[in-house]
From Swiss-Prot:
It comes from the Bacteria. Belongs to the bacterial ribosomal protein bS21 family. HAMAP family: Ribosomal_bS21 (MF_00358). GO terms for cellular component: ribonucleoprotein complex; ribosome. The lineage of its organism: Bacteria, Pseudomonadati, Pseudomonadota, Gammaproteobacteria, Enterobacterales. PANTHER family: MITOCHONDRIAL 28S RIBOSOMAL PROTEIN S21 (PTHR21109), SMALL RIBOSOMAL SUBUNIT PROTEIN BS21 (PTHR21109:SF22). Keywords: Ribonucleoprotein, Ribosomal protein. It comes from Buchnera aphidicola subsp. Schizaphis graminum (strain Sg). This is Small ribosomal subunit protein bS21. Gene3D superfamilies: Ribosomal protein S8. It holds the Pfam family Ribosomal_S21.
Length: 71
């Protein structure tokens, strides 16, 4: 869990903003959303595989676009 130390004479909203930013960087909200409902292991594997395929397609598209620009 992210911990911030409130500095002397620091307004509350500034400290809250720093805390929210550190929570976002740690990925806490995404983890909570992911664990909100039970996901069967098969569904989890299927989702992970689909995201890997999507990542690969995106990478290949970028590389292909880079090659086209070179010529």
């Amino acid at each position: 869990m992210p911990i911030i130390k409130v500095r002397e004479n620091e307004p509350f909203d500034v400290a809250l903003r720093r805390f929210k930013r550190s929570c976002e960087k740690a990925g806490i909200l995404a983890e909570i959303r992911r664990r909100e409902f039970y996901e069967k292991p098969t569904t989890e594997r299927k989702r992970a595989k689909a995201s890997a395929i999507k990542r690969l397609a995106k990478k290949l598209t970028r590389e292909n676009a880079r090659r086209i620009r070179m010529y």
